[in-house]
């Protein structure tokens, strides 16, 4: 049996301000740092260790991984930073307050933009200050791979090649892998692993800084999955994530 651990970054500054973030590179809050360190402690106390880590090229995920590794005394393990694990791109919503956007467009429209499988938000215009094309993180990527908006379907389409060519082979080779990423890149992986339908994925939320453990068989099919930590607190965190896109 293989184990894979997924952990969403701790609370970011724009999580705190209830803004759509996407590919904008904001940092962790003090609460987010504490969440990441608690995630590392939970993993250490449960007897986990890792041979290899994956994360995105955005500092809120990278720094979360650092704190997890520090708590586990695993700062030394190899880490792969991969743009394909970035949060989904929120296009023209990037930087906007979610509740204010819901007040303007309605809760249902914002729910569709946030959680539907195949409806992207309005796109940025190329060259907008929020457009990541030309950023050194994405040097060498063609224009078509640096999005101006994405839906979850688009996120799945960029995450799965990384899973198939790198992450899955690493796990099958016996490496113990942890992935520190984002709500929607993790939703993309969970959708694939658990074969969740396009309709049902709307209801899936991922809490900040909470280790999600997958036990996988030899073919990397899930045997079971579970969150580490206080289950009531996790339920409250999931409810808070679900409510972020509603008008106040």
Curated annotation (Swiss-Prot):
Pfam families listed in its UniProt record: His_Phos_1
Binding site for substrate: 8-15, 21-22, 60, 87-90, 98, 114-115, 183-184
UniProt entry keywords in alphabetical sequence: Gluconeogenesis, Glycolysis, Isomerase
InterPro entries, per the entry: His_Pase_superF_clade-1 (IPR013078), His_PPase_superfam (IPR029033), PG/BPGM_mutase_AS (IPR001345), Phosphogly_mut1 (IPR005952)
Record's keyword annotation contains Isomerase: yes
Pathway: Carbohydrate degradation; glycolysis; pyruvate from D-glyceraldehyde 3-phosphate: step 3/5
CDD domains recorded: HP_PGM_like
Site (Transition state stabilizer): 182
SMART domains on file: PGAM (SM00855)
Catalytic activity field: (2R)-2-phosphoglycerate = (2R)-3-phosphoglycerate
UniProt xrefs under SUPFAM superfamilies: Phosphoglycerate mutase-like
Broadest EC class assigned to this enzyme: isomerase
EC numbers for this chain: 5.4.2.11
GO terms classed as biological process: gluconeogenesis; glycolytic process
Statement: the UniProt record of this protein carries the keyword Amino-acid biosynthesis: no
Top-level taxon of the source organism: Bacteria
Protein family membership: Belongs to the phosphoglycerate mutase family. BPG-dependent PGAM subfamily.
HAMAP family per UniProt: PGAM_GpmA
Complex and partners: Homodimer.
Role noted for this protein: Catalyzes the interconversion of 2-phosphoglycerate and 3-phosphoglycerate.
PANTHER family: PHOSPHOGLYCERATE MUTASE (PTHR11931)
Protein name (Swiss-Prot/TrEMBL): 2,3-bisphosphoglycerate-dependent phosphoglycerate mutase
Originating species: Ralstonia nicotianae (strain ATCC BAA-1114 / GMI1000) (Ralstonia solanacearum)
Lineage: Bacteria, Pseudomonadati, Pseudomonadota, Betaproteobacteria, Burkholderiales
């Amino acid at each position: 049996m293989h184990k894979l651990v997924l952990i969403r970054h701790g609370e970011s500054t724009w999580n705190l301000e209830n803004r759509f973030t996407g590919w904008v590179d904001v940092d962790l809050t003090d609460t987010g740092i504490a969440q990441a360190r608690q995630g590392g402690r939970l993993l250490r106390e449960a007897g986990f260790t890792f041979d290899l880590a994956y994360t995105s090229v955005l500092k809120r995920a990278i720094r979360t991984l650092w704190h997890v590794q520090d708590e586990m005394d695993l700062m030394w393990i190899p880490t792969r930073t991969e743009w394909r694990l970035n949060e989904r791109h929120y296009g023209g919503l990037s930087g906007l307050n979610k509740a204010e956007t819901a007040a303007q467009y309605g809760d249902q429209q914002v729910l569709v933009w946030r959680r539907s499988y195949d409806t992207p938000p309005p796109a940025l215009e190329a060259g907008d200050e929020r457009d990541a094309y030309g950023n050194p993180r994405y040097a060498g990527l063609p224009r078509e791979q640096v999005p101006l908006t994405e839906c979850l379907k688009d996120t799945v389409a960029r995450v799965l090649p990384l899973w198939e060519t790198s992450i899955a082979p690493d796990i099958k080779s016996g490496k113990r892998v942890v992935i520190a990423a984002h709500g929607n890149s993790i939703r993309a992986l969970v959708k694939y692993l658990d074969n969740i339908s396009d309709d049902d994925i709307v209801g899936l939320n991922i809490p900040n800084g909470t280790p999600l453990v997958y036990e996988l068989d030899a073919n990397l099919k899930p045997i079971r999955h579970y969150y580490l930590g206080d289950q009531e607190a996790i339920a409250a965190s999931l409810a808070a994530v679900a409510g972020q896109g509603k008008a106040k």
